[in-house]
């Protein structure tokens, strides 16, 4: 935290933000993994929830839409499609880009550069 307080240039801010956004993306992978684990092992039943979506909503205020998105992000970008670790090729994209890229075919996702903006990814989605 102290290192953030010493940033004194725009470039320093950009570097720090990229690092933090990467951590958020990795968090999405982990949240998706834990939700899938809860769903697959039916852990939600331990507290009487009907499904993983009710558990996520009641416990963490995660909507069904976001729970599905977290699990899709894990399916798509985690190692072997079911792990708490992001695939190396998707490191550095950030959570917003990964979320936008979900709708792209795999062959298109594979060629989206890390420095593409969310706006550029949306433009590609419109063309496809």
Predicted features, each with a name:
Residues 77-128:
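Amphipathic alpha-helical oligomerization/scaffolding segments
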Residues 1-60, 75, 79, 104-115:
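N-terminal acidic-hydrophobic amphipathic loop/helix motif that frequently occurs adjacent to catalytic
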Residues 72:
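Positions that flank functional sites
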Residues 65:
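Key DNA-contact positions within bacterial/archaeal DNA-binding proteins
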Residues 69:
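DNA-binding alpha-helical recognition surfaces that contact promoter or target DNA
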């Amino acid at each position: 935290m102290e290192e953030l307080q010493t940033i004194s240039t725009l470039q320093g801010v950009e570097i720090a933000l990229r690092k933090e956004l990467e951590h958020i993306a990795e968090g999405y992978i982990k949240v998706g993994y834990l939700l899938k684990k809860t769903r697959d092992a039916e852990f939600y039943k331990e507290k009487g929830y009907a499904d993983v979506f009710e558990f996520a909503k009641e416990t963490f205020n995660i909507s069904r839409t976001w729970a599905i998105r977290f699990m899709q992000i894990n399916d798509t970008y985690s190692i072997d499609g079911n792990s708490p670790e992001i695939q190396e090729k998707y490191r550095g994209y950030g959570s917003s880009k990964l979320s936008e890229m979900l709708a792209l075919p795999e062959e298109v996702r594979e060629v989206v550069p890390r420095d593409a903006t969310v706006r550029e990814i949306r433009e590609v989605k419109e063309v496809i």
